[in-house]
Amino acid sequence: MRLALFGGSFDPPHNAHLALCLCARELLDIDKLIISVSNNPLKENRSASNAHRLAMAELLVSEINATGRIAEVSRWELERSGPSYTIDLLTRIGQLYPEEPVTLLIGEDNFRGFRQWKSWQEILERCYVVVFRRPLEHAAFDDAYAHLPGIPDRHQVRFIDFDFQLSSTAIRYAIATGEPYAHLVPPSIADYIASRHLYSERS
């Protein structure tokens, strides 16, 4: 079974998260997509609780699976103590699915800081990495890729053009300031946020 791993705080999940997952399902040879909800140690005042973030991640998975069941939520990072590191999550995935190939899905911003990740070279040795980048960022990414020393195989990193710019931070700000936001998140998540007054003065 071929696995893909997509991690994040999902505070909240939004349409770019959904589009990325659907894109990965269509373009990559994967059988299961694991959505891992990470710890949020730098929690802001208007960040949602772990329980809410987990519930919204489940709604994201339902949106993904509406057109073909492939995704599931992992709460392992939330249930362990301490900060979240991708290398530790990969170790856990390897315990659950020994010998199964894993593809790590990341956005362009994360790739720019990839060399600051804990054990980043080991990550490249243990899984494939797919970077979703903006179409106009080719030169910058080619340069960043060229300066990653110690890559065991140049084919371990693949780039996919993905022109869908959204951030959870911007959505939280929009909600807090009373701006429209429902068009930025899947409908089920918009309903969840509204019914629980998340990220607003009433939360």
UniProtKB/Swiss-Prot annotation:
Entry annotated with the keyword Nucleotide-binding: yes
Catalytic class of the enzyme: transferase
Source organism of the structure: Prosthecochloris aestuarii (strain DSM 271 / SK 413)
UniProt name for this protein: Probable nicotinate-nucleotide adenylyltransferase
Domain of life of the organism encoding this protein: Bacteria
Pathway assigned to this chain's UniProt record: Cofactor biosynthesis; NAD(+) biosynthesis; deamido-NAD(+) from nicotinate D-ribonucleotide: step 1/1
Cystine residue pairs: none
Record function comment: Catalyzes the reversible adenylation of nicotinate mononucleotide (NaMN) to nicotinic acid adenine dinucleotide (NaAD).
Entry keyword set: ATP-binding, NAD, Nucleotide-binding, Nucleotidyltransferase, Pyridine nucleotide biosynthesis, Transferase
Recorded family membership: Belongs to the NadD family.
Record-linked SUPFAM superfamilies: Nucleotidylyl transferase (SSF52374)
Alphabetized InterPro entries for the sequence: Cyt_trans-like, NadD/NMNAT, Rossmann-like_a/b/a_fold
One MF term in the entry's GO annotations: nicotinate-nucleotide adenylyltransferase activity
Biological process, per Gene Ontology: NAD biosynthetic process
EC number(s) reported in the record: 2.7.7.18
Pfam family, one: CTP_transf_like
Catalytic reaction annotation: nicotinate beta-D-ribonucleotide + ATP + H(+) = deamido-NAD(+) + diphosphate
Coiled coil regions, renumbered to chain: none
Gene3D superfamilies xref list: HUPs
